[in-house]
């Protein structure tokens, strides 16, 4: 069973980063840094597939094995892959420090082999009042992505 994973984020533009995952008890600690962003919040999600053959679009929808509506990371009703937002400072750097109890590095909620995506816009956490909000949080375009792999 994997206890650590890593993801290198890359896209067509300047956005890039490295994200690390570590299983700690019943949670996964997600840490790292993303550069090249515009200042403010950006949706941050695990997507269904580890397929980046057509850029980030081939990663599919948010990882959602429980067939729930989109929500925030603290919500009961959420996709497994819904990790909310990362916030970039005025220099375009987002420091990631998330503890999540729904994603896993093993079992049916395993994110290993799936794609991590950082989005153009803020995730409205399913509270946007339209159908797209309940699917994607209106986070819009995928700026950078990478497949999550087992790490030492």
Swiss-Prot record:
The modification N6-succinyllysine is found at residues 4, 10, 90, 121, 135. GO terms for biological process: reactive oxygen species metabolic process. Zn(2+) binds at residues 62, 70, 79, 82. The modification Phosphoserine is found at residues 101, 104, 106. InterPro entries: SOD-like_Cu/Zn_dom_sf, SOD_Cu/Zn_/chaperone, SOD_Cu/Zn_BS, SOD_Cu_Zn_dom. Binds 1 copper ion per subunit. Binds 1 zinc ion per subunit. Residues 55-77 are annotated as: Disordered. Pfam families: Sod_Cu (PF00080). It is an enzyme of class 1 (oxidoreductase). Its cofactor is Cu cation; Zn(2+). A lipid is attached at residue 7 (S-palmitoyl cysteine). Palmitoylation helps nuclear targeting and decreases catalytic activity. Succinylation, adjacent to copper catalytic site, probably inhibits activity. Desuccinylation by SIRT5 enhances activity. It catalyses: 2 superoxide + 2 H(+) = H2O2 + O2. The modification N6-acetyllysine is found at residues 121, 135. The modification N-acetylalanine is found at residue 2. It is found in: Cytoplasm; Nucleus. Keywords: Acetylation, Antioxidant, Copper, Cytoplasm, Disulfide bond, Lipoprotein, Metal-binding, Nucleus, Oxidoreductase, Palmitate, Phosphoprotein, Zinc. Its EC number is 1.15.1.1. Disulfide bonds join 56-145. One of its GO terms (molecular function) is copper ion binding. GO terms for cellular component: cytoplasm; nucleus. Cu cation binds at residues 45, 47, 62, 119. Destroys radicals which are normally produced within the cells and which are toxic to biological systems. Belongs to the Cu-Zn superoxide dismutase family. Homodimer; non-disulfide-linked. Heterodimer with SOD1. The heterodimer CCS:SOD1 interacts with SLC31A1; this heterotrimer is Cu(1+)-mediated and its maintenance is regulated through SOD1 activation. This is Superoxide dismutase [Cu-Zn]. It comes from Cervus elaphus.
